[in-house]
Amino acid sequence: MATGGKKSAGRTTGSGPAGGSRNLTVKVKTAKRRKLSSTLWLQRQLNDPYVHEAKRLGYRSRAAFKMIQLDERFHILKPGLRVVDLGAAPGGWTQVAVEKVGALKPKGGGKVVGMDILEWDPLPGAITLQGDFLADDAPDRLKEALGGPADVVLSDMAAPTTGHPSTDHLRIIGLVEVALHFALEVLTPGGTFVAKVFQGGTEKTLLDQLKKNFTTVRHAKPPASRQGSAETYVVATGFRGSSE
């Protein structure tokens, strides 16, 4: 989750950087006390057109463009919908959700509730909660803030990477499973669940559960997702409804 400017939502934009972006590459010298990994990260940020475009448009992170692109393809967010955003900080996805569902409208608008384990700044049009989603009280806090069923549950949660692909894959699948369990409790029939996974997709048991509860399950890697990143997203639409 890259950080960017902290302006509020309220703009319309396309799904990618403006055509006038500079084709210049910035090289960063490694300071004596700066690790090579930090230098490479800084250089990548400086040369990333999505980072520049996020700042220009007032999005808190480049991740906003991932949500915009997923929404353009799958039509996830619509006016009046109620959305839960898990792993929301610093708020890029939340900003897009606020815009798309019209959460700032005094009448007829949607509702957006976000939660992250990290502290994050309040966002106009959204209820921003700080807390560990794995904590026992987290689901109830989200349900109370939402005040009713959700139409969309988004999860951009990710565990710290270890550098060991199999371990990282299992960790993020665990987060997806917990997010899915919550989604099955709060989604209204016809609802949508979107979650970050790593390449290799979902485990068979998780995929079977998704297919059992949703009419359509697809994987997608939006253009704004870094080419070198192993992340991809599972998009499950058409929630069949609770079996209880």
Swiss-Prot record:
Where it sits in the cell: the answer is: Cytoplasm
The reactions it catalyses are: uridine(2552) in 23S rRNA + S-adenosyl-L-methionine = 2'-O-methyluridine(2552) in 23S rRNA + S-adenosyl-L-homocysteine + H(+)
Q: Does the keyword Transmembrane helix apply?
A: no
Q: Which Enzyme Commission number(s) are listed?
A: 2.1.1.166
In the record, which residues are listed under signal peptide? none
Q: Which key words are in the record?
A: Cytoplasm, Methyltransferase, rRNA processing, S-adenosyl-L-methionine, Transferase
Sorted alphabetically, the Gene Ontology cellular component annotations on this record are:
cytoplasm
- Where does the UniProt entry say this protein principally localizes? cytoplasm
One term of GO molecular function: rRNA (uridine-2'-O-)-methyltransferase activity
- Residues of the active site are 196 (proton acceptor)
Q: Which Gene3D superfamilies match?
A: Vaccinia Virus protein VP39
Disulfide-linked positions: none
- Where is S-adenosyl-L-methionine bound in this sequence? 91, 93, 116, 132, 156
Q: What is the annotated role of this protein in its UniProt record? A: Specifically methylates the uridine in position 2552 of 23S rRNA at the 2'-O position of the ribose in the fully assembled 50S ribosomal subunit.
The family assignment reads: Belongs to the class I-like SAM-binding methyltransferase superfamily. RNA methyltransferase RlmE family.
Return the PANTHER family for the record. Answer: RIBOSOMAL RNA METHYLTRANSFERASE, RRNA METHYLTRANSFERASE 2, MITOCHONDRIAL
Q: What is this protein called?
A: Ribosomal RNA large subunit methyltransferase E
Naturally occurring in which organism (per UniProt)? Paramagnetospirillum magneticum (strain ATCC 700264 / AMB-1) (Magnetospirillum magneticum)
Q: Which gene encodes it?
A: rlmE
